[in-house]
Amino acid sequence: RQMCIRDSFYREDGRAQGESDALERGDFEAFLHLVQNSGESSYCLLQNVYPSSVPAEQPVSIAIAVGSAVLGGRGAIRVHGGGFGGTVQAFVPSVLLTQFRDGMEAVLGEGCCHVLQIRPIGGMTILI
C-alpha cells in the first residue's frame, strides 16, 4: 500500500505540471487526459474515495462510476477535495451536459449537479 501511495504522489507532481503546460499551450484534450489519470490514481492507488471504516457507503465511488459511464471516455471525472465523502469534479462537454445531469440525478438525486462554467481568462486584480 505504501508503494502505491508513493507512486501516486510522485507521478502527481508530473501530472500537475503537465496539466499546467497543456493549458498554456491550449491543449484542453491533453489537460483532460491528465485530470482523468490523476483521478484514477486517487481512486485506485490512494483509495481515498470512501472511508475504510464504512465500506458499505461509497457515494463518491458511485458518482464516479455513473459519471464515467455517461461520459463514455469524453471529458473527465475525478474525486475532488478531501475525498472520503467529498465531491466529484467533472469536465463535461457541452453536448453531454443535459444527459450527464439527468444520469447523475437519476442515481444520486435531484440537485446533485452544480453546473459551473470556466471563464476564458484567468484571475484578475481590480484596483479601486
Place the predicted regions along the sequence by residue.
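C-terminal nucleotide
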Residues: 2, 6-78, 89-128
